[in-house]
Amino acid sequence: MAELAQEWRCGSRVLDLGRTRIMGVLNVTPDSFSDGGAHDSLAEALAWADKMLDDGADLIDVGGESTRPGFTPVGQDEEIARVVPVIEALAARGVLVSVDTRHPGVARAALDAGAHILNDVSGFEDPEMVRVAAEYGCGVVAMHACKGYLAGQARADAGKDSAGFAREVKAYLLHQAHVLEQAGVDPSSICIDPGPGFGTNADEDLAVQAATSATTHLGYPYLCAPSRKRFVGAVSGSNPAVARDAATAGVVCAAALAGARIVRVHDVRTCAQALRCLEACAGIAPARRAFIALGGNMGDRLASLKAACSALDALPQTGVVAASRVYETEPAYLGDQDLFANAVVEISTRLHPRALIEALLGIEDAAGRVRTVKNGPRCLDVDLLWMEGERHAGPRLTCPHPLIGERDFVLVPLGDLVDDVEAFCAREGIACVAPGQRVGHIERVLGNLA
Protein backbone atom coordinates (compact mmCIF):
# COMPACT_ATOMS: atom_id res chain seq x y z
CA MET A 1 0.00 0.00 0.00
CA ALA A 2 1.46 3.34 -1.04
CA GLU A 3 1.94 6.24 1.36
CA LEU A 4 -0.37 9.24 1.18
CA ALA A 5 0.78 11.88 -1.30
CA GLN A 6 2.70 14.69 0.41
CA GLU A 7 2.61 17.23 -2.40
CA TRP A 8 0.89 18.00 -5.68
CA ARG A 9 3.02 19.45 -8.46
CA CYS A 10 1.06 21.94 -10.54
CA GLY A 11 3.35 23.33 -13.22
CA SER A 12 5.55 25.98 -11.63
CA ARG A 13 3.80 25.58 -8.27
CA VAL A 14 3.88 22.85 -5.64
CA LEU A 15 0.96 22.46 -3.24
CA ASP A 16 2.04 21.08 0.13
CA LEU A 17 -0.42 18.39 1.28
CA GLY A 18 0.58 18.31 4.92
CA ARG A 19 -2.95 19.49 5.64
CA THR A 20 -6.19 19.21 3.70
CA ARG A 21 -6.37 21.92 1.03
CA ILE A 22 -9.53 23.66 -0.12
CA MET A 23 -10.41 24.19 -3.78
CA GLY A 24 -13.01 26.93 -4.05
CA VAL A 25 -15.62 26.52 -6.79
CA LEU A 26 -16.01 29.50 -9.13
CA ASN A 27 -18.68 28.83 -11.75
CA VAL A 28 -18.87 31.50 -14.44
CA THR A 29 -21.92 29.87 -15.98
CA PRO A 30 -25.61 30.77 -16.13
CA ASP A 31 -26.83 27.23 -15.39
CA SER A 32 -24.75 25.55 -12.66
CA PHE A 33 -26.90 23.43 -10.36
CA SER A 34 -26.54 25.56 -7.21
CA ASP A 35 -25.05 28.94 -8.14
CA GLY A 36 -25.75 29.45 -11.83
CA GLY A 37 -25.60 33.08 -12.91
CA ALA A 38 -24.27 34.35 -9.58
CA HIS A 39 -20.83 35.28 -10.94
CA ASP A 40 -21.49 36.16 -14.58
CA SER A 41 -19.49 39.39 -14.81
CA LEU A 42 -15.72 39.56 -14.38
CA ALA A 43 -16.08 41.88 -11.40
CA GLU A 44 -18.56 39.55 -9.68
CA ALA A 45 -16.37 36.52 -10.36
CA LEU A 46 -13.24 38.16 -8.98
CA ALA A 47 -15.07 39.47 -5.92
CA TRP A 48 -16.30 35.96 -5.13
CA ALA A 49 -12.83 34.52 -5.68
CA ASP A 50 -11.40 37.09 -3.25
CA LYS A 51 -13.97 36.12 -0.65
CA MET A 52 -13.13 32.43 -1.00
CA LEU A 53 -9.39 33.14 -0.78
CA ASP A 54 -9.83 35.14 2.40
CA ASP A 55 -12.15 32.47 3.80
CA GLY A 56 -9.37 29.90 3.41
CA ALA A 57 -9.35 28.58 -0.16
CA ASP A 58 -5.92 27.38 -1.25
CA LEU A 59 -6.81 27.34 -4.95
CA ILE A 60 -9.68 28.39 -7.19
CA ASP A 61 -11.37 26.09 -9.74
CA VAL A 62 -12.84 28.14 -12.61
CA GLY A 63 -15.56 26.49 -14.69
CA GLY A 64 -17.29 27.77 -17.81
CA GLU A 65 -19.55 24.80 -18.60
CA SER A 66 -22.05 23.29 -16.20
CA THR A 67 -22.02 19.48 -16.06
CA ARG A 68 -25.02 19.15 -13.74
CA PRO A 69 -27.60 16.47 -14.59
CA GLY A 70 -29.29 17.40 -17.86
CA PHE A 71 -26.72 20.09 -18.70
CA THR A 72 -26.55 21.83 -22.07
CA PRO A 73 -23.09 21.56 -23.71
CA VAL A 74 -21.26 24.81 -24.39
CA GLY A 75 -19.17 25.61 -27.46
CA GLN A 76 -15.43 25.97 -26.86
CA ASP A 77 -15.34 29.62 -27.97
CA GLU A 78 -18.06 30.53 -25.47
CA GLU A 79 -16.37 28.57 -22.71
CA ILE A 80 -13.03 30.29 -23.43
CA ALA A 81 -14.71 33.70 -23.35
CA ARG A 82 -16.14 32.89 -19.93
CA VAL A 83 -13.06 31.49 -18.18
CA VAL A 84 -9.95 33.14 -19.68
CA PRO A 85 -10.46 36.71 -18.34
CA VAL A 86 -11.03 35.34 -14.84
CA ILE A 87 -8.01 33.04 -15.01
CA GLU A 88 -5.77 35.83 -16.33
CA ALA A 89 -6.76 38.15 -13.50
CA LEU A 90 -6.34 35.55 -10.75
CA ALA A 91 -3.07 34.13 -12.06
CA ALA A 92 -1.58 37.63 -12.37
CA ARG A 93 -2.08 38.04 -8.62
CA GLY A 94 -0.37 34.77 -7.78
CA VAL A 95 -3.49 32.69 -7.14
CA LEU A 96 -3.20 28.94 -7.76
CA VAL A 97 -5.82 28.37 -10.48
CA SER A 98 -7.52 25.26 -11.84
CA VAL A 99 -9.74 25.18 -14.92
CA ASP A 100 -12.71 22.82 -14.95
CA THR A 101 -13.00 21.74 -18.59
CA ARG A 102 -13.20 18.65 -20.79
CA HIS A 103 -12.28 20.42 -24.03
CA PRO A 104 -8.67 20.55 -25.35
CA GLY A 105 -9.08 23.98 -26.92
CA VAL A 106 -10.33 25.45 -23.67
CA ALA A 107 -7.57 23.67 -21.77
CA ARG A 108 -4.86 25.22 -23.95
CA ALA A 109 -6.37 28.69 -23.73
CA ALA A 110 -6.70 28.42 -19.95
CA LEU A 111 -3.13 27.21 -19.48
CA ASP A 112 -1.84 29.96 -21.76
CA ALA A 113 -3.78 32.42 -19.58
CA GLY A 114 -1.96 31.20 -16.46
CA ALA A 115 -3.94 28.24 -15.11
CA HIS A 116 -1.85 25.67 -13.24
CA ILE A 117 -4.26 22.71 -13.22
CA LEU A 118 -6.58 20.90 -15.66
CA ASN A 119 -9.64 19.46 -13.92
CA ASP A 120 -11.23 17.12 -16.48
CA VAL A 121 -14.61 15.61 -15.60
CA SER A 122 -14.21 13.16 -18.48
CA GLY A 123 -11.15 11.63 -16.83
CA PHE A 124 -8.70 12.44 -19.65
CA GLU A 125 -10.31 9.85 -21.90
CA ASP A 126 -9.75 12.23 -24.83
CA PRO A 127 -6.18 11.57 -26.08
CA GLU A 128 -5.84 15.24 -27.01
CA MET A 129 -6.49 16.26 -23.39
CA VAL A 130 -3.75 13.84 -22.34
CA ARG A 131 -1.38 15.44 -24.86
CA VAL A 132 -2.18 18.91 -23.55
CA ALA A 133 -1.46 17.81 -19.97
CA ALA A 134 1.87 16.27 -20.95
CA GLU A 135 2.88 19.22 -23.12
CA TYR A 136 2.23 21.87 -20.48
CA GLY A 137 3.46 19.91 -17.46
CA CYS A 138 0.52 21.17 -15.43
CA GLY A 139 -1.31 19.60 -12.52
CA VAL A 140 -4.23 17.38 -13.52
CA VAL A 141 -7.41 16.09 -11.89
CA ALA A 142 -8.65 12.86 -13.47
CA MET A 143 -12.29 12.35 -12.50
CA HIS A 144 -14.59 9.37 -12.83
CA ALA A 145 -17.97 9.87 -14.49
CA CYS A 146 -20.34 7.01 -15.20
CA LYS A 147 -20.22 5.81 -18.78
CA GLY A 148 -22.62 7.79 -20.95
CA TYR A 149 -23.33 10.45 -18.31
CA LEU A 150 -21.64 13.29 -20.18
CA ALA A 151 -23.55 12.25 -23.33
CA GLY A 152 -26.86 12.32 -21.45
CA GLN A 153 -27.33 8.53 -21.50
CA ALA A 154 -29.07 6.66 -18.69
CA ARG A 155 -27.36 3.73 -16.96
CA ALA A 156 -28.79 0.24 -17.12
CA ASP A 157 -26.85 -1.13 -14.12
CA ALA A 158 -27.38 1.64 -11.56
CA GLY A 159 -27.51 0.52 -7.95
CA LYS A 160 -26.98 -3.20 -8.44
CA ASP A 161 -23.75 -3.52 -6.44
CA SER A 162 -22.56 -0.44 -4.57
CA ALA A 163 -19.44 -2.06 -3.11
CA GLY A 164 -18.51 -3.42 -6.52
CA PHE A 165 -19.09 0.01 -8.01
CA ALA A 166 -16.62 1.56 -5.56
CA ARG A 167 -14.00 -0.98 -6.62
CA GLU A 168 -14.68 -0.16 -10.28
CA VAL A 169 -14.18 3.55 -9.61
CA LYS A 170 -10.87 2.89 -7.86
CA ALA A 171 -9.68 0.70 -10.74
CA TYR A 172 -10.75 3.30 -13.31
CA LEU A 173 -8.86 6.09 -11.55
CA LEU A 174 -5.73 3.98 -11.29
CA HIS A 175 -5.96 3.12 -14.99
CA GLN A 176 -6.41 6.74 -16.07
CA ALA A 177 -3.49 7.79 -13.88
CA HIS A 178 -1.34 5.20 -15.64
CA VAL A 179 -2.52 6.49 -19.04
CA LEU A 180 -1.36 9.97 -18.06
CA GLU A 181 1.97 8.68 -16.75
CA GLN A 182 2.64 6.73 -19.94
CA ALA A 183 2.06 9.93 -21.92
CA GLY A 184 4.74 11.70 -19.90
CA VAL A 185 2.75 13.36 -17.12
CA ASP A 186 4.70 13.46 -13.85
CA PRO A 187 3.01 11.08 -11.35
CA SER A 188 3.26 13.76 -8.64
CA SER A 189 1.15 16.05 -10.88
CA ILE A 190 -1.78 13.61 -11.02
CA CYS A 191 -4.76 14.00 -8.69
CA ILE A 192 -7.72 11.60 -8.72
CA ASP A 193 -11.40 12.36 -8.07
CA PRO A 194 -14.13 9.67 -7.79
CA GLY A 195 -16.74 12.11 -9.13
CA PRO A 196 -19.77 11.83 -6.83
CA GLY A 197 -23.01 12.72 -8.57
CA PHE A 198 -21.83 12.11 -12.12
CA GLY A 199 -24.40 9.47 -13.00
CA THR A 200 -24.33 7.84 -9.57
CA ASN A 201 -27.00 7.23 -6.96
CA ALA A 202 -26.73 7.90 -3.23
CA ASP A 203 -25.80 4.33 -2.28
CA GLU A 204 -22.98 4.31 -4.83
CA ASP A 205 -21.69 7.70 -3.71
CA LEU A 206 -21.71 6.59 -0.08
CA ALA A 207 -19.86 3.39 -0.97
CA VAL A 208 -17.22 5.43 -2.78
CA GLN A 209 -16.88 7.76 0.21
CA ALA A 210 -16.48 4.75 2.50
CA ALA A 211 -13.64 3.54 0.25
CA THR A 212 -11.75 6.84 0.48
CA SER A 213 -8.93 5.46 2.62
CA ALA A 214 -8.19 2.61 0.21
CA THR A 215 -8.23 4.97 -2.77
CA THR A 216 -6.01 7.62 -1.16
CA HIS A 217 -3.39 4.93 -0.58
CA LEU A 218 -2.94 4.51 -4.32
CA GLY A 219 -0.36 7.25 -3.71
CA TYR A 220 -1.92 10.04 -5.78
CA PRO A 221 -3.37 13.24 -4.32
CA TYR A 222 -7.08 12.59 -3.78
CA LEU A 223 -9.76 15.20 -4.38
CA CYS A 224 -13.11 14.89 -2.60
CA ALA A 225 -15.86 16.90 -4.31
CA PRO A 226 -19.18 16.31 -2.49
CA SER A 227 -20.28 19.94 -2.36
CA ARG A 228 -24.07 20.29 -2.38
CA LYS A 229 -24.45 16.96 -4.21
CA ARG A 230 -27.71 15.00 -4.17
CA PHE A 231 -26.36 12.19 -1.99
CA VAL A 232 -25.46 14.78 0.66
CA GLY A 233 -29.05 16.01 0.61
CA ALA A 234 -30.41 12.46 0.66
CA VAL A 235 -28.60 11.44 3.86
CA SER A 236 -28.88 14.80 5.66
CA GLY A 237 -32.41 15.75 4.63
CA SER A 238 -31.15 19.14 3.45
CA ASN A 239 -32.72 20.66 0.34
CA PRO A 240 -32.40 22.57 -1.95
CA ALA A 241 -28.75 22.31 -2.97
CA VAL A 242 -27.72 25.63 -1.40
CA ALA A 243 -28.93 24.34 1.99
CA ARG A 244 -26.37 21.52 2.03
CA ASP A 245 -23.23 23.40 3.07
CA ALA A 246 -23.15 22.24 6.70
CA ALA A 247 -23.81 18.68 5.57
CA THR A 248 -21.06 19.02 2.97
CA ALA A 249 -18.65 19.98 5.76
CA GLY A 250 -19.47 16.70 7.49
CA VAL A 251 -18.57 14.71 4.37
CA VAL A 252 -15.40 16.75 3.91
CA CYS A 253 -14.25 16.06 7.47
CA ALA A 254 -14.84 12.32 7.07
CA ALA A 255 -12.88 12.36 3.83
CA ALA A 256 -10.02 14.32 5.40
CA LEU A 257 -9.72 11.76 8.19
CA ALA A 258 -9.56 9.05 5.51
CA GLY A 259 -6.70 10.77 3.68
CA ALA A 260 -8.32 13.16 1.18
CA ARG A 261 -5.94 16.10 0.85
CA ILE A 262 -7.94 18.35 -1.48
CA VAL A 263 -11.64 19.13 -1.10
CA ARG A 264 -13.68 21.03 -3.68
CA VAL A 265 -16.48 23.12 -2.15
CA HIS A 266 -18.74 26.10 -2.78
CA ASP A 267 -18.93 27.34 0.84
CA VAL A 268 -15.26 27.73 1.71
CA ARG A 269 -15.75 29.42 5.07
CA THR A 270 -17.87 26.65 6.60
CA CYS A 271 -15.59 23.87 5.40
CA ALA A 272 -12.40 25.73 6.35
CA GLN A 273 -13.62 26.28 9.89
CA ALA A 274 -14.73 22.67 10.20
CA LEU A 275 -11.40 21.36 8.90
CA ARG A 276 -9.38 23.59 11.24
CA CYS A 277 -11.27 22.25 14.25
CA LEU A 278 -11.07 18.67 12.98
CA GLU A 279 -7.30 18.87 12.50
CA ALA A 280 -6.79 20.51 15.90
CA CYS A 281 -9.00 18.11 17.86
CA ALA A 282 -7.75 15.01 16.05
CA GLY A 283 -4.14 16.08 16.53
CA ILE A 284 -3.38 15.91 12.83
CA ALA A 285 -2.61 19.58 12.11
CA PRO A 286 1.05 19.75 11.09
CA ALA A 287 3.47 21.97 13.01
CA ARG A 288 4.82 24.65 10.70
CA ARG A 289 7.61 27.18 10.94
CA ALA A 290 6.56 30.82 10.54
CA PHE A 291 8.16 34.25 10.79
CA ILE A 292 6.32 37.13 12.45
CA ALA A 293 7.38 40.79 12.15
CA LEU A 294 7.00 43.04 15.20
CA GLY A 295 7.25 46.83 15.11
CA GLY A 296 6.13 50.07 16.69
CA ASN A 297 7.16 53.65 17.39
CA MET A 298 4.98 54.79 20.30
CA GLY A 299 5.55 54.54 24.04
CA ASP A 300 8.10 52.08 25.41
CA ARG A 301 8.91 50.40 22.12
CA LEU A 302 11.08 47.61 23.49
CA ALA A 303 8.56 46.73 26.19
CA SER A 304 5.76 46.61 23.60
CA LEU A 305 7.70 44.18 21.40
CA LYS A 306 8.58 41.99 24.38
CA ALA A 307 4.91 41.84 25.38
CA ALA A 308 3.95 40.91 21.82
CA CYS A 309 6.54 38.13 21.79
CA SER A 310 5.07 36.75 25.03
CA ALA A 311 1.58 36.96 23.53
CA LEU A 312 2.76 34.95 20.51
CA ASP A 313 4.15 32.27 22.80
CA ALA A 314 0.79 32.09 24.59
CA LEU A 315 -1.26 31.41 21.44
CA PRO A 316 -2.84 27.94 21.24
CA GLN A 317 -0.81 25.29 19.42
CA THR A 318 2.00 27.82 19.05
CA GLY A 319 5.41 28.48 20.57
CA VAL A 320 8.22 30.97 20.05
CA VAL A 321 11.35 29.25 18.73
CA ALA A 322 13.75 32.17 18.29
CA ALA A 323 13.84 35.95 18.02
CA SER A 324 16.06 38.41 16.20
CA ARG A 325 17.70 41.38 17.81
CA VAL A 326 15.56 44.51 18.07
CA TYR A 327 16.58 47.22 15.63
CA GLU A 328 15.87 50.92 15.60
CA THR A 329 14.77 51.87 12.08
CA GLU A 330 13.76 54.91 10.10
CA PRO A 331 10.06 55.28 9.22
CA ALA A 332 9.00 53.62 5.98
CA TYR A 333 6.56 55.09 3.44
CA LEU A 334 5.58 58.05 5.66
CA GLY A 335 8.21 60.39 7.12
CA ASP A 336 8.00 62.98 9.90
CA GLN A 337 7.40 60.51 12.72
CA ASP A 338 9.47 58.87 15.44
CA LEU A 339 11.92 56.05 14.77
CA PHE A 340 10.57 52.51 14.95
CA ALA A 341 11.68 49.43 16.85
CA ASN A 342 11.52 46.28 14.70
CA ALA A 343 12.21 42.59 15.16
CA VAL A 344 11.30 39.22 13.63
CA VAL A 345 10.18 36.23 15.68
CA GLU A 346 10.27 32.60 14.56
CA ILE A 347 7.39 30.47 15.80
CA SER A 348 6.22 26.89 15.41
CA THR A 349 2.45 26.65 15.05
CA ARG A 350 -0.30 24.23 14.14
CA LEU A 351 -2.77 27.04 13.47
CA HIS A 352 -4.15 27.59 9.98
CA PRO A 353 -2.69 30.81 8.50
CA ARG A 354 -6.13 32.48 8.56
CA ALA A 355 -6.55 31.63 12.24
CA LEU A 356 -3.01 32.86 12.90
CA ILE A 357 -3.66 36.20 11.18
CA GLU A 358 -6.80 36.72 13.26
CA ALA A 359 -4.76 35.98 16.39
CA LEU A 360 -2.09 38.50 15.34
CA LEU A 361 -4.74 41.17 14.84
CA GLY A 362 -6.01 40.33 18.32
CA ILE A 363 -2.54 40.94 19.78
CA GLU A 364 -2.46 44.34 18.07
CA ASP A 365 -5.91 45.23 19.38
CA ALA A 366 -5.00 44.19 22.93
CA ALA A 367 -2.00 46.53 22.77
CA GLY A 368 -4.29 49.43 21.86
CA ARG A 369 -3.54 49.62 18.15
CA VAL A 370 -5.66 52.24 16.40
CA ARG A 371 -5.68 52.17 12.59
CA THR A 372 -6.17 55.75 11.45
CA VAL A 373 -3.31 57.06 9.28
CA LYS A 374 -1.91 54.47 6.85
CA ASN A 375 1.78 53.82 7.62
CA GLY A 376 1.52 56.37 10.42
CA PRO A 377 2.57 56.12 14.08
CA ARG A 378 1.47 52.96 15.86
CA CYS A 379 2.04 51.26 19.17
CA LEU A 380 2.37 47.81 17.62
CA ASP A 381 2.47 45.99 14.29
CA VAL A 382 2.30 42.18 14.24
CA ASP A 383 2.52 40.82 10.68
CA LEU A 384 2.71 37.31 9.27
CA LEU A 385 5.71 37.34 6.94
CA TRP A 386 6.03 33.72 5.86
CA MET A 387 4.68 30.31 6.82
CA GLU A 388 6.12 26.96 5.80
CA GLY A 389 4.17 25.29 2.99
CA GLU A 390 1.66 28.14 2.72
CA ARG A 391 1.04 30.44 -0.21
CA HIS A 392 -2.04 32.65 -0.34
CA ALA A 393 -3.05 35.62 -2.49
CA GLY A 394 -6.29 36.93 -1.00
CA PRO A 395 -6.85 40.60 -0.12
CA ARG A 396 -6.76 39.77 3.61
CA LEU A 397 -4.95 36.43 3.67
CA THR A 398 -1.67 37.03 1.81
CA CYS A 399 1.39 34.87 2.39
CA PRO A 400 4.29 35.41 1.98
CA HIS A 401 3.90 39.08 2.84
CA PRO A 402 4.16 40.93 -0.50
CA LEU A 403 6.50 43.68 0.77
CA ILE A 404 9.20 41.61 2.49
CA GLY A 405 11.76 42.15 -0.25
CA GLU A 406 11.76 45.95 -0.09
CA ARG A 407 11.85 46.37 3.69
CA ASP A 408 15.25 46.73 5.35
CA PHE A 409 13.49 46.63 8.74
CA VAL A 410 12.31 43.10 7.89
CA LEU A 411 15.21 41.65 5.90
CA VAL A 412 17.94 42.57 8.40
CA PRO A 413 16.26 41.02 11.47
CA LEU A 414 15.15 38.05 9.35
CA GLY A 415 18.83 37.58 8.57
CA ASP A 416 19.39 36.88 12.28
CA LEU A 417 17.18 33.79 11.96
CA VAL A 418 18.16 32.27 8.59
CA ASP A 419 21.60 31.44 7.24
CA ASP A 420 21.30 33.48 4.04
CA VAL A 421 18.31 35.80 3.85
CA GLU A 422 18.59 36.43 0.10
CA ALA A 423 18.85 32.69 -0.64
CA PHE A 424 15.85 32.08 1.62
CA CYS A 425 13.82 34.71 -0.22
CA ALA A 426 14.85 33.31 -3.60
CA ARG A 427 13.68 29.81 -2.60
CA GLU A 428 10.33 31.22 -1.52
CA GLY A 429 9.80 33.33 -4.65
CA ILE A 430 10.35 36.63 -2.83
CA ALA A 431 12.15 39.26 -4.91
CA CYS A 432 14.64 41.34 -2.89
CA VAL A 433 15.64 44.83 -3.97
CA ALA A 434 19.17 46.18 -3.52
CA PRO A 435 19.94 47.47 0.01
CA GLY A 436 20.14 51.07 -1.16
CA GLN A 437 16.63 50.89 -2.64
CA ARG A 438 14.93 49.49 0.46
CA VAL A 439 12.67 51.38 2.84
CA GLY A 440 12.88 51.58 6.62
CA HIS A 441 16.66 51.37 6.89
CA ILE A 442 18.34 50.16 10.07
CA GLU A 443 19.79 52.87 12.33
CA ARG A 444 21.19 50.77 15.19
CA VAL A 445 20.66 47.72 17.40
CA LEU A 446 18.24 48.65 20.17
CA GLY A 447 18.29 45.50 22.30
CA ASN A 448 16.93 41.96 22.57
CA LEU A 449 13.51 40.41 23.16
CA ALA A 450 14.81 37.91 25.72
Predicted regions and their residues:
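Active-site-adjacent loop and "lid" segments of alpha/beta metabolic enzymes
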Residues: A2-E3, C10, L17, S34-A43, ...
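Extreme N-terminal starter segment of soluble prokaryotic enzymes
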Residues: E3-E7, R21, A287-F291
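Catalytic domains of carbohydrate-active enzymes, especially glycoside hydrolases
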Residues: A47-G63, A258-G259
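Short, charge-patterned binding micro-sites
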Residues: S66-F71, A151, A322-S348
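Short acidic capping loops at alpha-helix termini that bridge into adjacent secondary structure
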Residues: D186-S189
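N-terminal beta1-alpha1 ligand-phosphate binding loop
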Residues: A285-T318, S324-E330
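Flexible, gly/pro- and Lys/Arg-enriched active-site loops
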Residues: A332-F340, L351-A450
